[in-house]
Each structure stands twice: as structure tokens, then as C-alpha cells.
Amino acid sequence: MYCSDYHTHSQLSPDSSAPLEQMAQAAVEAGLDELCVTDHCDLLTLQGEPVERYDWPPAVAQYQAAAAQFSSGLTLKLGLELGMGHLNPAAAQTIVGQPELDFVLGSVHNQSPEKGGVDFYYVPYPDSAACYAALDDYFASMAILAATPCYDVLAHIIYPLRYMEAPVSLEGYYDRIRAILRTAVENGRGMEVNTYRGRTVAEWKPILELYRDCGGEILTVGSDAHIPGGVGKGIREAMELIAGCSFRYVCTYDKRKPVFHKL
């Protein structure tokens, strides 16, 4: 089974201090075949201020140095996690036009600007009502993002749940999630199973079933690791879940094109 971790962060993300070489070494030690670094580029800051560009030269230089160091034993790819790209499609398209880029995750990390624009990490969730209000806003933004051309795979479509402690069910959102996934499928894009460093695997089963019903085939798996110790966490379990949901492949990417690996 070809094992890849397609959601990882390095010192070029504001919430990580790990050199890419350390993340790559951790991938080797975890027995992975392929690692994609997907550092953050969010078009809103954590507090909701707009951003219009990304500093590519340090990212390309770090990637090229690590790729040379790990030229045998590990395939290393250059990706990007582009957050809130739907808010500025022109800027998003410029950012993802980098020729060295292999892969783009499209994510929603923030509330909509109308709701304040802050990262869902900072939103208070005192009760279930607050959780559902946040989810309403989140899936509305995700629906807009899904229709844009600035990503290859939708990242962690259940993202806000990781911060919510009150009881929450996604069943009331299945129609919205199905519509989001159908939009991605119709545009030749895919979905990520994000293990949240091994903490969320089983939660993806109903989402995978919705994706399958939409005709989805492109799936990537990512740990969302921000430190070497998180690399590869939950990847094999996620692949087993994917196979159990009747999918035949997981994907990696090369210059924005999916490569299918049989499960």
C-alpha cells in the first residue's frame, strides 16, 4: 500500500517551527512513501485582516534543499494550503500560479468577513447553538470556495468540529455537504481525509459515503502535522477506512495533476 501524507506544515507556517528536513526525516521513519508540505497561505489573518500575496522564494528554496537531501527513499512534493481563496479569486490565482507547485489544498479557516473573519479556533463555543451558528457560516463559505478554480482538493471539510466540545451532529448539514462535494467533483477536484494527527478518522465515514454518492474518486490523506512527531499519524487507518467505503484509490499530485494509487 502506497502511503502518503498530503497535509503537513513546516517553519514557513505561522503555527509551526519545524524545518522541512525534520518533517521529511519523520516521514521516512514513519515508513511513508511520499510527503507533501502544504504550508499556510491564508487570505485572511487569524484576526480577519486581508492578505493578497505569498512569499514563494523561501518556500521554493526550502523545498529544493530538502528534496535534494531526500532524493532517495522519499518522494517530496511542494504544496500549499490556500485558505479563504474565494474571498480574492484574482490574488488566489496569482498565488497558485507558481510553476514549482505540485498541489493546492483549499480550506476555510475563518468566519466570513460578515461574521468578523476570525479563525474558527478563536470563536467561542459555549453551547450547541453557538456551534451550529459557526457551522452555518462555515459551510456557506465552503460552498463558495468549492466553486472556485484555486484548489485541487478540499481540505478538512469538517474543520470546525475539532474545536467544539458541545454535542454537535452534522446530519442536518448532509445536504449542504453533498452539494459542496458534488461541486468539487463536477469541477474535477477532490476531497481530503484529514486525520488531525490521528485524532479524527472514524468521523470521516459518513463524509466519505456522501462523497462516494456524488461520484467522487479523488481522495488525498493528510495528518495536518505541524511537528515531526505528527507526521503520518492516522494515515494507514484512514486508508483502511477509505477502502472500507468502497474507494479503490488514494491520490498524490504532480504539478497539479492527480496520480492514482491502488489501495
Regions found by a protein language model. Give the residues of each.
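Domain-core and long-helix interface of multi-subunit machines
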Residues: 14, 107-216
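Hydrophobic residues within beta-strands of alpha/beta enzymes
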Residues: 35-37, 104, 154, 191, ...
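C-terminal regulatory/interaction regions
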Residues: 245-248, 257-263
